[in-house]
Amino acid sequence: MELTKIFLAFLCIGVSYSLGSFPSGFIAGKWLKGIDLRKVGSGSTGATNVLRHVGKKAALIVFLIDVSKGIGSILIAKSLFLSPSFHVICGIAALSGHIWPIWLNWKGGKAVATGLGVFLGISWQVGLASLGIFMAVLSSSKIVSLSSISAAISLPILMFLSLQEASFLNAYIIASFAAMIMVLWRHRANLKRLLNGDEPRIGKIN
């Protein structure tokens, strides 16, 4: 690989991480309510915690920004490199930035909205299908975390079904498993509450 391509590759990864780490939820909490979302509710800077402690309009804006961060990272990667493996690296960089933002002492969101954006960028069909699963579970359970976990678990299956020549070594399949693991890891506390039957539903403060 030429030095220029190496430079562009590292630049793209850095930009993807920076996009992912943009603290939209944190800014919304500070600007609109004067609160640090890392210290209230679930401690997440994602749209769900914004919904519970800032408001519906702010949560929608944060959600759209976070989705855009994921889409942007993939579009930039696709514009510079043809390799699916590199698209995956940039997508994971964006997810890592969202979960562990350097600007907020490594404490950010749970990668759901940004993950949706990443997979909309990789395969809009898979992204929309996972969103459909999220909405279906949310409609029946009224529990955001359960909906997020269900959508994350569906990703490898949806990606496998979407590829004509799928294998477990396919870069996008690997990405779907990586994203699933990251989302499940960030929902550890939610999983415990779900098992105990005390996970809050929409409209309740946790």
Curated annotation (Swiss-Prot):
Q: What is the top-level taxon of the source organism?
A: Bacteria
Keyword annotations from UniProtKB, A to Z: Cell inner membrane, Cell membrane, Lipid biosynthesis, Lipid metabolism, Membrane, Phospholipid biosynthesis, Phospholipid metabolism, Transferase, Transmembrane, Transmembrane helix
Extract the Pfam families matched here.
G3P_acyltransf
| Disulfide feature | none
> Where do the TM regions start and end?
6-26, 57-77, 86-106, 118-138, 143-163, 165-185
Recorded catalytic reaction(s): these are: an acyl phosphate + sn-glycerol 3-phosphate = a 1-acyl-sn-glycero-3-phosphate + phosphate
Family designation:
Belongs to the PlsY family.
Q: Please report the record's description of how this protein sits within the membrane.
A: Multi-pass membrane protein
According to its UniProt entry, what is the function of this protein? Catalyzes the transfer of an acyl group from acyl-phosphate (acyl-PO(4)) to glycerol-3-phosphate (G3P) to form lysophosphatidic acid (LPA). This enzyme utilizes acyl-phosphate as fatty acyl donor, but not acyl-CoA or acyl-ACP.
Q: What class of enzyme is it?
A: transferase
- Known InterPro entries for this protein? G3P_acylTferase_PlsY (IPR003811)
Q: Look up the record and report any one GO term of the cellular component aspect.
A: plasma membrane
* Compartmental location: Cell inner membrane
Query: Could you tell me the gene encoding this protein?
Result: plsY
Q: Which GO terms describe its molecular function?
A: acyl-phosphate glycerol-3-phosphate acyltransferase activity
Which EC number(s) does UniProt give? 2.3.1.275
The protein's name in its UniProt record: Glycerol-3-phosphate acyltransferase
User: In which pathway does this enzyme or protein participate?
Assistant: Lipid metabolism; phospholipid metabolism
A Gene Ontology annotation in the biological process aspect, one of them, is: phospholipid biosynthetic process
Q: How does it assemble?
A: Probably interacts with PlsX.
- Chief subcellular location equals membrane
